[in-house]
A protein has these predicted regions:
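Acidic, Ser/Thr/Pro-rich beta/coil linker or hinge segments at domain junctions
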Residues: 2-3, 13, 29, 281-324
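Active-site-proximal betaalpha loop/short-helix elements
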Residues: 17, 102, 191-259
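Glycine-rich anion-binding loops of enzyme active sites
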Residues: 54-56, 61-63, 91-177, 290, ...
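Short, compositionally biased
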Residues: 176-192
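Helix N-cap motif at beta-to-alpha junctions
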Residues: 265-272
């Protein structure tokens, strides 16, 4: 595939385009509060709580996934929330959910998926709300986490000259129900998953990264774009350096939600230690690019370089840190 064709495919990817609704909505909710350290644009809001911070996040499941496989949707709703907290260098504490279903059968399938994920990750659902008789099926989960204030990882603090590192668990499969979901976590034990999740906490506590984010359903490049928007920085990404399963094409992989995947920025002197930390928990981590001052995301492939996003004209979410 030619680079120009790949760029066109990524720009038109629905997982990226649907993020553009965020910024106009957020403008209605901006206000000052002395206890809020960071909010919109981060994977979780950060609330001052003495020597610690509370982390608060929420995710709703894409209706396409709910229609394709309600049980997998329930599982993923837990998975994505836990990763939002982990990406901040935090520890997940508990979740609440809002479930709307059109039938008892759908309710059973979704709740079965939630139960499997709760058992797998050890983070409880402690309350919520259910609509048992709606004309639609929807699931939203909110999560509370915590972190030490001095070990917090934000996505809005990347710096010029930082290396860009991608860490992902390649031991998995494309989920049979949804072509844009990579499933590694159901193939791992609870102990293995706990160690993988704790990597981000270790990185935060040792101040090894300057910024970080979990890779979302906007895919790897969409997620990098969001990190660059919030940091008001640019990047150059070498597409041939991106770790991926051999059996999956690059164009497909770049649109996949990887399940256990994080994008990080770090100083050169910390890169080797970061790679080793992920390798110890059976994750693949590679340097795939670097941060630049010029506010655009450039991609390199087979000796050619092109601009994927030029900010702010191009936009993923339109958010800059806790501002928009």
């Amino acid at each position: 595939m030619e680079l120009s064709e790949l760029i066109s495919e990524i720009r038109s990817f629905e997982g990226i385009k649907r993020k553009r609704f965020i910024s106009p909505l957020v403008k209605r909710f901006l206000f000052d509060n002395s206890r809020v350290i960071a909010s919109f644009g981060e994977d979780a809001a950060v609330i001052d709580f003495g020597e610690e911070v509370l982390l608060l996040a929420a995710d709703g499941i894409w209706d396409k996934l709910m229609k394709a496989d309600p049980e997998w949707a329930g599982y993923c709703a837990v998975l994505v929330n836990i990763h939002d907290i982990a990406a901040m260098g935090g520890e997940p504490v508990a979740m609440v959910d809002v479930l709307s279903v059109s039938s008892a059968e759908k309710c059973l399938r979704v709740s079965r998926g939630i139960q499997k994920a709760v058992e797998k990750f050890g983070v409880p659902v402690v309350g919520g709300h259910v609509h048992p008789d709606t004309s639609y099926d929807a699931l939203d989960i909110a999560i509370l986490g915590k972190a030490k204030k001095n070990s917090l990882i934000l996505s809005s603090t990347a710096e010029k000259g930082d290396l860009l590192i991608y860490a992902v668990d390649l031991h998995g499969r494309i989920h049979p129900s949804f072509p844009f979901n990579w499933d590694s976590t159901t193939l791992r034990s609870s102990d293995e998953l706990k160690k993988q999740i704790e990597c981000m906490k270790i990185l935060g506590e040792n101040r090894l990264v300057t910024a970080g984010k979990d890779v979302s359903n906007s895919g790897l490049l969409g997620t990098i774009g969001m990190l660059l928007e919030t940091s008001v920085k640019g990047a150059v990404v070498n597409l041939e350096s991106i770790p991926k399963p051999e059996e999956i094409s690059l164009s497909h992989w770049l649109k996949v939600y990887p399940g256990m995947g994080f994008i990080l920025t770090a100083k050169d002197e910390n890169a080797d230690e970061i790679l080793k930390i992920f390798q110890r928990v059976k994750m693949r981590a590679e340097v795939i690019g670097f941060i630049q001052e010029e506010w655009k995301l450039e991609v390199e492939f087979k000796g050619e370089k092109r601009v994927l996003f030029s900010f702010p004209e191009d936009s993923v979410t339109g958010l800059r840190g806790s501002r928009c």
